[in-house]
A protein has these predicted regions:
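Multi-pass alpha-helical membrane architecture of UbiA-family
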Residues: 1-160
């Protein structure tokens, strides 16, 4: 719905999805904490980044239907840069989660390094003049990121 009104619909989608980890945190810990909000912010940035990448495939349909998106408004080259910046901010948020009160350690840090590497790989697949690998980047790489980071967190919390 927001695509009818603003090019920043990617943000609203990210905000909607970020409610899940914050809500899970509240359900388990019965509090909203700085840590839960950092996790939510990381999810927002992750979703913004990959939704912008995927929206590059829809640029012509968006224009034909007078819908708004970052790629439609700013062009594919700028959209790719904005997606990369969003993913970089996500990694920063994930690194801030290493604060001492969160009790995550070196295994989690290795997971964040893997996520950062996968995001760089994801962005290397997509070129402004060749969007043929967007689906692979969107579905495969992001699937590995989500399951991989969860696995590293579980190992760090349970076995280390």
């Amino acid at each position: 719905m927001t695509k009818r009104f603003t090019a920043f619909s990617h943000f609203w989608l990210g905000l909607a999805i970020s409610i899940a980890p914050v809500g899970a945190w509240v359900a388990i810990r019965e509090e909203i904490s700085f840590t839960s909000l950092l996790l939510g912010a990381a999810v927002i940035c992750w979703l913004i980044g990959f939704d912008i990448l995927y929206a590059c495939l829809d640029i012509e349909a968006d224009r034909a239907n007078r819908l708004h998106s970052i790629p439609e408004r700013f062009g594919i080259e700028t959209a790719l840069k904005m997606a990369f910046a969003s993913h970089a901010v996500m990694v920063v948020f994930l690194l801030v989660l290493l604060e001492p009160t969160v009790l995550l350690g070196w295994v989690y840090l290795a997971g964040v390094a893997l996520v950062a590497g996968l995001l760089v790989y994801e962005h290397s697949l997509i070129k402004k003049d060749d969007l043929s690998k967007v689906n692979m980047a969107f579905f495969n790489v992001n699937g590995i990121i989500s399951i991989g980071l969860m696995a590293f967190v579980i190992v760090d919390c349970v076995w280390v």
